[in-house]
UniProtKB/Swiss-Prot annotation:
Keywords per UniProt: Disulfide bond, Glycoprotein, Membrane, Phosphoprotein, Receptor, Repeat, Signal, Transmembrane, Transmembrane helix
Domain CUB: from-to ranges: 45-159, 177-292
Recorded GO CC terms: glutamatergic synapse; postsynaptic density; postsynaptic density membrane
GO biological process: neurotransmitter receptor localization to postsynaptic specialization membrane; regulation of neurotransmitter receptor localization to postsynaptic specialization membrane
Subcellular compartments: Membrane
Membrane-topology descriptor: Single-pass type I membrane protein
GO molecular function, one term: ionotropic glutamate receptor binding
Post-translational modification as stated in the protein's UniProt record: N-glycosylated.
S-S bonds: 45-72, 100-122, 177-207, 234-256, 297-309, 304-322, 316-331
Residues passing through the membrane, by range: 348-368
Lineage per the UniProt record: Eukaryota, Metazoa, Chordata, Craniata, Vertebrata
Assembly behavior: Interacts with GRIK2 and GRIK3, but neither with AMPA-nor with NMDA-sensitive glutamate receptors.
Protein name: Neuropilin and tolloid-like protein 2
Gene expressing this chain: NETO2
Glycosylation sites per record: 311
Length: 525
């Protein structure tokens, strides 16, 4: 009995184990069947496989019918100096329509939706072989709300570009050339490639600049300088802008003509790519990037009036960071950096040494000049003669009437004697003429004659003395009454001689240092 019960328990346990193991095996089998199958989100368009030499892609749900109201875009990119070759499988069906107005497949020669159109395809027949003229191809699949079909499956591969056969065919591997920038603003420069020697002279340029904005910000790009050596030849040189990553799907703009416009990115990561072949090394660009947030603006940001808020540190910094120059309007002109602000450490050292040398020489010169005059003054004091300086610098002392008393009295005595003799002679001559002639006309002539005689007498008297420089002149006037003779006939002109005015100018001259004086007498009637 006990053995039978034990056997029954073992059977139950065995059955339970087998059931559990069976369930586990079934679960593993189901999981194994799901390996390699990827659930495609509703927003993704089919399967796309990429390789270094090409790849393949298909319409959504291929080989089943594609969904209605679907739009998928595929952008193919080859390596530099290569083209793209596109082929389709035979299992192909897209709703046919006139000029493919409804469901269709659109292929363009380039990376954009506005690139040259190659053709539109629909119907039951697969498209022929398609080749691009450059390294990009833009493909769009579109379906409407009715009549879905099988769809398509396409393969693409990269082939050498025959336009570059003169350069040796396929391009040699280009060295890594990448740069990173971040912050509120900054400048992307193509000249950085040569400065950091990322490429060798004569080598093609294929460089990437990755820009990271400040947190929660987007990026605004503005070209400060732009020049393509071969304009409108995108195969040879271009500047491309990507929004979010360097993937071809995120290509925002591409410039290879003569003009480059501003670009607003929707994310905080921007990628700038420059391509220039060996013959386009003169191509260059310089680009300003600015981090911005959308309004409303905070206290730490500035409103640019163009749906932009930039950091306050970028206002009035001499650079236009807004799309319009609102941030640089109403700014006070900043003073230019002074001379001392521009002096570097080396300049300061040179100026300091030079100034020290000049200062030492100046001090030595001052000491020499201070000591030298003192010696000269000491030498002059020993040879100083007060008497000589007294004679040279003291003015001469003049005394009026410094004649000796004897000489003055003798001169005055001689002068008075001469005057008396002259008066007597004059009276006698006048009286005799008036008595004998009995007229007054002769008296006038006698007066004239007397004056003539007086002048003749005066000349030798004045010539006795030389004419030195006069020092002072004084006049002595003597009034004397004239004698009148009453004759039988009165003379009317005799009244002129009632008074005799005698002026005796005395002039004193000093000759040299001698105290001698001379006098001259002039008598006028």
């Amino acid at each position: 009995m006990a053995l039978e019960r034990l056997c029954s328990v073992l059977k139950v346990l065995l059955i339970t184990v087998l059931v559990v193991e069976g369930i586990a095996v079934a679960q593993k089998t189901q999981d194994g069947q799901n390996i390699g199958i990827k659930h495609i989100p509703a927003t993704q368009c089919g399967i796309w496989v990429r390789t270094s030499n090409g790849g393949h892609f298909a319409s959504p749900n291929y080989p089943d019918s594609y969904p209605p109201n679907k739009e998928c875009i595929y952008i193919l990119e080859a390596a530099p100096r290569q083209r793209i070759e596109l082929t389709f499988d035979e299992h192909y069906y897209i709703e046919p329509s006139f000029e493919c107005r409804f469901d269709h497949l659109e292929v363009r020669d380039g990376p954009f939706g506005f690139s040259p159109l190659i053709d539109r395809y629909c119907g039951v027949k697969s498209p022929p072989l398609i080749r691009s003229t450059g390294r990009f191809m833009w493909i769009k699949f579109s379906s409407d709300e009715e009549l879905e079909g099988l769809g398509f499956r396409a393969k693409y591969s990269f082939i050498p570009d025959p336009d570059f056969t003169y350069l040796g065919g396929i391009l040699n591997p280009i060295p890594d050339c990448q740069f990173e920038l971040s912050g509120a603003d900054g400048i992307v420069r193509s000249s950085q490639v040569e400065q950091e020697e990322k490429t060798k002279p004569g080598q093609a340029v294929d460089c990437i600049w990755t820009i990271k904005a400040t947190p929660k910000a987007k990026i605004y790009l503005r070209f400060l300088d732009y020049q393509m050596e071969h304009s409108n030849e995108c195969k040879r040189n271009f500047v491309a802008v990507y929004d979010g990553s360097s993937s071809i799907e995120n290509l925002k703009a591409k410039f290879c003509s003569t003009v480059a416009n501003d670009v607003m990115l929707k994310t905080g990561i921007g990628v700038i790519r420059m391509w220039a072949d060996e013959g386009s090394r003169l191509s260059r660009f310089r680009m300003l990037f600015t981090s911005f947030v959308e309004p409303p603006c905070t206290s730490s940001t500035f409103f640019c009036h163009s749906n932009m808020c930039i950091n306050n540190s970028l206002v009035c910094n001499g650079v236009q960071n807004c799309a319009y120059p609102w941030d640089e309007n109403h700014c006070k002109e900043k003073k230019k950096a002074g001379v001392f602000e521009q002096i570097t450490k080396t300049h300061g050292t040179i100026i300091g040494i030079t100034s020290g040398i000049v200062l030492v020489l100046l001090i030595i010169s001052i000491l020499v000049q201070v000591k030298q005059p003192r010696k000269k003054v000491m030498a002059c004091k020993t040879a100083f003669n007060k008497t000589g300086f007294q004679e040279v610098f003291d003015p001469p002392h003049y005394e009026l009437f410094s004649l000796r008393d004897k000489e003055i009295s003798a001169d005055l005595a001689d002068l008075s004697e001469e005057l008396d003799n002259y008066q007597k002679m004059r009276r006698s001559s006048t009286a005799s003429r008036c008595i004998h002639d009995h007229h007054c006309g002769s008296q006038a002539s006698s007066v004239k004659q007397s004056r003539t005689n007086l002048s003749s007498m005066e000349l030798p008297f004045r010539n006795d003395f030389a004419q030195p420089q006069p020092m002072k002149t004084f006049n002595s006037t003597f009034k004397k009454s004239s004698y009148t003779f009453k004759q039988g006939h009165e003379c009317p002109e005799q009244a002129l001689e009632d008074r005799v005015m005698e002026e005796i100018p005395c002039e004193i001259y000093v000759r040299g240092r001698e105290d001698s004086a001379q006098a001259s007498i002039s008598i006028d009637f």
